[in-house]
Amino acid sequence: SSSHRDEKYWLRHIIEGVLALCPQASFEIFGEHEIYKLYRDLPRVSVLHPMTWQNYLAYTKTHRLDIGLAPLLDSGFNLARGPVKFYDFVRMGAVGIYSNRSPYSDFIEQNVNGVLLENDPQKWIKALSVLVNTETKRSELARNAKKHAYSLANQ
């Protein structure tokens, strides 16, 4: 959404770095034309047009990802967020990499059901590259995230 505009700009350097290190990696990002222009020169990056909540929910139920990215930069708006991306990523079978801040820092168990990182682009490039290249770790974290989501739903 447009509320993540700054994060999409912040991610560009990270995505470019991972693409250079991992030729098998590809990325999808939601964004308006401004975001398309920002990413159009990068190979293996698709910019998807924003969609209604109903369509997005259907998309996350039928689309599979390996890794989801949920950076949160400093802003008043981000202070009020819930861990929604965790559930989106679980629906898509993915492990998430999250900024180590609320709401994720109190919700994600580090390297058990997700990865928490400070907002240091080099750390994101390294962690993302490791997960891209380590299918067993990706799968383990995604399985644990799914178990965590189900345990919360059954409380």
Feature locations, PLM:
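Conserved catalytic-core segment of nucleotide-activated headgroup transferases in glycan assembly
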Residues: 1-62
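Nucleotide-sugar-dependent
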Residues: 6-9, 53-54, 58-91, 97-106
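A charged, aromatic-enriched C-terminal amphipathic alpha-helix characteristic of glycosyltransferases
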Residues: 119, 136-155
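CheY-like receiver
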Residues: 59, 127-130, 148
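Conserved acidic donor-binding segment of nucleotide-sugar-dependent glycosyltransferases
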Residues: 108-122, 130-135
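Glycosyltransferase donor-binding loop in the core domain
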Residues: 2-3, 81, 149-150
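Hydrophobic residues in well-ordered beta-strands that form the structural core
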Residues: 29, 98-99, 116
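Residue-level signal for the nucleotide or nucleotide-sugar donor/cofactor binding architecture
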Residues: 6, 51, 84, 119, ...
